[in-house]
Amino acid sequence: MCSSDLHYINSQMAKVQAVKAGYDEAILLSPQGYVSECTGENIFVVTDGTIVTPPTSAGALAGITQDCIRRIAGDLGIPYVQGNLLRSDLYTADEAFLSGTAAEVVPIRSVDDRVIGDPGPITRQVQEVFFQAVRGERPEYSDWNDHVDA
């Protein structure tokens, strides 16, 4: 078994524990206590208008959809940084969302029973542009899609 297999086993165990506890998803922390990622998605917070996502040095896997979010944020003029996040940063975030190949872009409404709230304006804006891009409605992101004749 290779190390990436162990990563996914740990993620799935965390997901099972989260669901048993009544949550939809688990947020994984690094050994140093930094927010790393969710079980199959990257995590983002929005604080003071800036999108922040954990770096790979915190244990986050680099994500294809994460890179799409970075590109969309840049195109929209929204500051985007990779930086260490503490669990408490999730509690005080203005907005939070996750992204992944299967999940796409999903707002986070609460963490540890602490309400973040409805999707905020930046999450909604990034989510809408992402959905338009994957539907082929945004020519500037046409390199993300391979069109297949049915």
Describe each region flagged by the PLM.
Residues 1:
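Glycine-rich phosphate/oxyanion-binding loops and their immediately adjacent helices
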Residues 4-150:
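Helix-start/capping segments and mature chain N-termini
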